[in-house]
């Protein structure tokens, strides 16, 4: 009750005989919780350098009443107040006031069931760093150590910074003195800062270093992998027996195992065993907890004039090798880290199936990731007279792709170079819906995609707490018209491409232009994750895309365009190869013309906070700001015409269902050109994707 602000709670315990047994008693607990008491004001005294307002801001968990602040209550909790007092003194020490202390603090209960906190502070004088000498170092010289320490003579004294630059407990891969030794074999090293003298306002230090003996990794083992085969794990482990010990390799191993997606990233624990300073060896055992890696979807219903059914599954830890092993089907053969996905969907007017397979480790020590996919889609026209599908009017799209990706070593091994060759075949018969510029004909799309990406996000791929990702990709077809020299500038004057009345036959012209699609597409995505405080994470993201043509006479293709706005969930029915770009706060695809955009940009700032990160379900809340728009050319591009929005939402990730979520977003701008009224509120449901 006191943690909820009921400081005057009273509890009385009474016992009465129990009629059931002679030796039994009933206990009655009478609780009078009283009124909730909130902090009315926080008063400081003795502070001369920093204002009351500044010091109140350093009390992270103890806040006085403030109208409109809903995210932090003004209740008083003893433990939180004690922690805040320590933070307050640390703030003074960071600014050079080493002797700062809280002389006294008191609580005054007011008549209106509120309280006043009074804090009396003695700031003391400001100190500065004097001489900083290194003692005991032989591996690194003084200059190298000073570069890492980052503190110079004459700097304002900062005990918190000094401690952090020697060993940062909150950041395992920090650039500090301890990690300098730990990352280069000196597991048994120890570093201590000792104050040797204080002259007036100057403090002199010695950094005493015991380098110890070089250490090597001895036995490396894993436990807890009940489904995943050992070889899948060991190929990701950076700590090798016989190699020099490196803390950085241990941290990187934890990150790589978490990125696999097969284990609970919050429970990956490297356990140091048999640490022997005499022999200079250490064993490491990685403790793992398997997480679900399969998603199955079976749906059925009636709507749109007929039965709608879909079936799909995605197995992220599949094993082709165990296909013939009947005992391995539980419900799928698992353990080799492969990804297998299959989806079937059928209605009266639409049927589609797709298959994809990814082998993440094709080859030996320098492997490639191999991927392949197949898909086929048929869409029939709706007959308004019969209410049924007219199978004489249809569109069919068949596609396949094959890809290779390789992790690079330069600039660093967070980089990946991927390449994909894709072919799509479009067959249209009497399909005059406006989706394509021609309703009879065929089109072929043979393209090559190359992408350079870097991903150094921290361990948990569902909720990264640091790091960044970026991808720069280019998608290209052959410049057929430049190779063949075919002239598309004057097709309208050719009688073959004219209607009987002499007017240009636009559909026939477009069929000639786009029988083999000719284009290039450039895209960029950059995402950064920054820890604000504790588990509060800021995600910032920027996206850009451009679709261009080699031959201006042939023009831009009606396929592969960008459609901006909404939840981004219409990819399944993107029949013309369009890319649906989510921008919350606006209706789906409302920020592009009917024909789509050739250019788009988008910016996102999103605050995330986890509610739970358990293997069974990861849940986090978010609030965001977004802006972006679609354009028809670079000449029309104007970043000041971006459509802005803000909102909040929640994400739930369950291994069996993938990512689910809902967002409530307010669009601040109009989707109708020339109008200024805001679009207003939109609700977006998120299934199986992440922004």
Model-derived regions: residue spans:
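In a subset of proteins, long, contiguous C-terminal domains/tails are tracked
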Residues: 493-494, 503-506, 519, 528, ...
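Outer-membrane beta-barrel transmembrane domain signature
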Residues: 628-645
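C-terminal outer-membrane beta-barrel translocator/porin domains of Gram-negative envelope proteins
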Residues: 277-278, 294-303, 434-611, 623-624, ...
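Hydrophobic alpha-helical bundle architecture
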Residues: 606-614, 637-638, 651
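Outer-membrane beta-barrel domain signature
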Residues: 16, 77-79, 106-108, 163-167, ...
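Gram-negative/organellar outer-membrane beta-barrel architecture
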Residues: 4, 8-10, 20-21, 38, ...
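Periplasmic polypeptide-binding modules associated with outer-membrane biogenesis and secretion
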Residues: 1-302, 306, 315, 323-354, ...
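Secondary-structure transition into beta-strands, especially the periplasmic turns and strand N-termini
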Residues: 408-415, 530-538, 614-616, 658
């Amino acid at each position: 009750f006191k943690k909820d602000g009921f400081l005057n709670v009273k509890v009385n315990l009474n016992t009465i005989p129990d009629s059931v047994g002679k030796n039994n008693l009933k206990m009655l607990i009478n609780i009078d919780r009283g009124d909730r008491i909130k902090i009315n004001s926080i008063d400081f005294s003795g502070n001369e350098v920093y204002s009351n307002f500044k010091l109140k801001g350093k009390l992270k968990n103890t806040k006085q009443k403030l109208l409109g602040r809903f995210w932090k209550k003004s209740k008083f909790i003893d433990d939180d107040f004690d922690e805040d007092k320590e933070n307050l003194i640390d703030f003074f020490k960071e600014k050079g006031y080493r002797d700062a202390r809280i002389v006294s603090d008191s609580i005054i209960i007011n008549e209106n069931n509120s309280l006043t906190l009074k804090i009396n502070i003695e700031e003391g004088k400001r100190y500065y760093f004097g001489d900083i000498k290194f003692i005991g170092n032989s591996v690194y010289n003084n200059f190298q150590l000073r570069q890492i320490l980052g503190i110079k003579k004459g700097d304002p004294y900062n005990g918190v910074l000094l401690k952090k630059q020697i060993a940062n407990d909150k950041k395992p891969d920090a650039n500090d003195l301890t990690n300098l030794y730990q990352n280069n074999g000196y597991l048994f090293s120890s570093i201590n800062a000792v104050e040797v003298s204080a002259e007036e306002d100057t403090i002199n230090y010695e950094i005493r270093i015991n380098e110890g003996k070089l250490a090597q990794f001895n036995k490396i083992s894993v436990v807890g992998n009940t489904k995943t085969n050992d070889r899948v794990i060991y190929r990701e482990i950076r700590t090798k027996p016989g190699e020099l010990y490196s803390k950085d390799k241990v941290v990187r191993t934890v990150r790589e195992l978490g990125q696999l997606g097969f284990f609970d990233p919050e429970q990956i624990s490297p356990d140091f065993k048999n640490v022997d300073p005499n022999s200079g060896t250490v064993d490491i055992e990685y403790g793992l907890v398997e997480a679900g890696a399969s998603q199955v979807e079976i749906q059925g219903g009636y709507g749109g004039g007929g039965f709608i059914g879909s079936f799909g599954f995605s197995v992220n830890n599949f094993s082709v090798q165990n296909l013939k092993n009947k005992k391995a089907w539980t419900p799928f053969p698992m353990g080799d880290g492969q990804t297998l996905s299959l989806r079937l969907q059928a209605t009266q007017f639409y049927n589609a199936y797709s298959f994809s397979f990814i082998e993440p480790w094709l080859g030996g020590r320098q492997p490639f990731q191999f991927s392949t996919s197949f898909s086929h889609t048929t869409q029939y026209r709706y007959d308004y007279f019969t209410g049924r599908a007219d199978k004489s009017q249809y569109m069919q799209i068949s596609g396949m792709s094959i890809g290779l990706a390789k992790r690079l070593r330069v600039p660093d091994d967070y980089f990946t170079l991927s390449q994909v060759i894709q072919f799509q075949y479009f067959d249209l018969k009497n399909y005059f819906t406006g989706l394509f510029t021609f309703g009879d004909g065929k089109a072929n799309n043979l393209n090559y995609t190359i992408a350079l990406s870097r991903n150094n996000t921290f361990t948990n791929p569902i909720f990264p707490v640091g790091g960044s990702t970026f991808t720069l990709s280019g998608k290209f077809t052959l410049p057929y018209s430049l190779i063949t020299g075919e002239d598309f500038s004057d097709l309208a004057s050719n009688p073959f491409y004219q209607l009987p009345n002499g007017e240009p036959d636009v559909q026939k012209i477009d069929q000639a232009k786009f029988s083999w699609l000719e284009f290039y597409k450039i895209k960029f995505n950059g995402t950064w994750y920054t820890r604000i405080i504790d588990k509060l994470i800021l995600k910032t993201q920027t996206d850009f895309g451009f679709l261009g043509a080699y031959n201006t006479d042939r023009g831009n293709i009606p396929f592969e365009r960008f459609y901006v706005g909404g939840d981004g969930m219409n990819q399944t029915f993107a029949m013309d190869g369009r890319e649906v770009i989510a921008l919350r706060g606006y209706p789906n695809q409302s920020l592009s013309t009917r024909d789509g955009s050739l250019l788009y940009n988008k910016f996102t700032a999103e605050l995330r906070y986890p509610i739970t990160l358990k293997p069974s379900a990861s849940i986090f809340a978010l609030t965001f700001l977004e802006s972006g728009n679609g354009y028809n050319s670079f000449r029309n591009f104007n970043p000041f015409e971006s459509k802005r929005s803000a909102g909040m939402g929640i994400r739930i990730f369950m291994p069996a269902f993938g990512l689910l979520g809902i967002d409530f977003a307010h669009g601040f701008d109009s989707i109708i050109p020339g109008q200024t009224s805001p679009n207003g509120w939109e609700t977006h449901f998120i299934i199986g994707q992440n922004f």
